[in-house]
Amino acid sequence: MALTKIELKNSLIEQGLNKLEAKKVVEGFFEQIRVSLENGEDVKLSGFGNFELRDKSSRPGRNPKTGEAIPVSARRVVVFRPGQKLRSRVEKTKPKN
C-alpha cells in the first residue's frame, strides 16, 4: 500500500490541525518542491533525501514491438537520492511478502 496525500493530510488532522490547514500544508509542501525543481533548483530535505535534476543525453533506442531503431531525445529528469538516515531506517525494515 502506498502513502497518499490524503493520508498525509489525515495524519496532520490527527495531530491537531483542522482540515483546511492540513490541506494547505500538504499542498504547499509539494507545490514548493515542484516550483523549485521547475526553476532548476535541487531540493535537499535534511534527514530524508535530495531531489536532483539530471540531464540525460540523447541516445539510440529501439521500438520493442518492431525492433526498429529510434532515437531517444535528450531530456531532464528528476531523481531522488535518499539520505543516510532514511537509508539506514529502510534497511532495518523487513520485506513484506
Swiss-Prot record:
Superkingdom per UniProt: Bacteria
A GO CC annotation given for this chain: cytosol
Keyword hit for Transcription regulation: yes
InterPro entries per UniProt: Hist_DNA-bd, Histone-like_DNA-bd_CS, IHF-like_DNA-bd_dom_sf, IHF_alpha
Pfam families (alphabetical): Bac_DNA_binding
Bilayer-spanning residue ranges: none
Cysteine disulfide partners in this protein: none
GO molecular function list: DNA binding; structural constituent of chromatin
Keywords recorded for this protein, A-Z: DNA recombination, DNA-binding, Transcription, Transcription regulation, Translation regulation
GO biological process, one term: positive regulation of metabolic process
Entry function: This protein is one of the two subunits of integration host factor, a specific DNA-binding protein that functions in genetic recombination as well as in transcriptional and translational control.
Self-association and partners: Heterodimer of an alpha and a beta chain.
Cross-referenced PANTHER family: DNA-BINDING PROTEIN HU, INTEGRATION HOST FACTOR SUBUNIT ALPHA
Family: Belongs to the bacterial histone-like protein family.
Name this polypeptide is given: Integration host factor subunit alpha
